[in-house]
C-alpha cells in the first residue's frame, strides 16, 4: 500500500511464490495462506544451491479468477501472465478478476555454510477495485423467487492479461461481464467485489492505450443497449475525484436513469464522504 507500513496480511490472504533460476527457468511454486502470513510461519520448501543467483515472483490473491500462463515455458517475465481462466474459453464469460498483487526479487544464495538468507519482496497492486451502481431502473420481479437480474453490464476492450513485470499486455483485450446484484436497501443495481486490471502505463500515468474500456449496459430480455460510455473520458472528466494510478486504487461509477435520459456520473457518496453506503 502507499506508505511504509507492513500491511501484507490485511490485503492478501494467499501468496504464491514462483522461484526461477538465473536464466528464468521455473524451479518450483510454493503457496502460503493467510494464517502463515499473519504469524510469519511461511517456510519455503526450495532446495537452492549456495553461490547461485535466483529470481522469485510473488503473486497475491490468486484464486478462482486467476491463472498464471506460460511460466513453465517462458524465461522472460514479460511473457508470463496473470489472466482469468475463462479468457482461453470462448464459451465461458469472464465475470471478474481477483484482487491480485505482484512483486519480484533477484538474489544470490550465500556461499557460507549454515548462513540463513533473508530478503523482502515488495508486492504492488495489479488491480483496480471497481464499484458500479445503477439507479432509476425497475427492480427485479419481487413476485418471483427465481427472478433474474434483467440487465447485463459489460466492459468491452478490458485488459485481459498482466505480466510478471506487473505490466498490462496491450495486445490482449476482451469483454468482461460483471455480475450485478439488486440492493433493495439503496434501491439500485450494483457490482460486488469487482476488480479490473490496472489502467496506468509503465510510468504510472493514465494512458488511453491502457484504458480503452467501453462500459455498456443492456436489457437482457430485449437485447436493447441502454447506455454506452468511454471509461477513459470518464476518468479525465473526474480526475479531481478519481486517481486510478494509486496503489489500492478505486474506480466508482454511477449510471443514472431519469425517464428517457441516462448519464454516467460520479456516485453521490464520492462527493460526500468517499465511501459507498454498502461498505
Where on the chain are the PLM-derived regions?
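Repeat-unit-sized solenoid/scaffold elements
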Residues: 56-62, 128-146, 243-255
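Short amphipathic, basic-aromatic surface patches that mediate peripheral association
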Residues: 1-10, 134-142
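Tryptophan-paired
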Residues: 11-71, 142-240, 278-279
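Generic structural motif
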Residues: 2, 22, 51-53, 61-63, ...
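Short, low-hydrophobicity acidic/polar segments
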Residues: 5, 16, 25-126
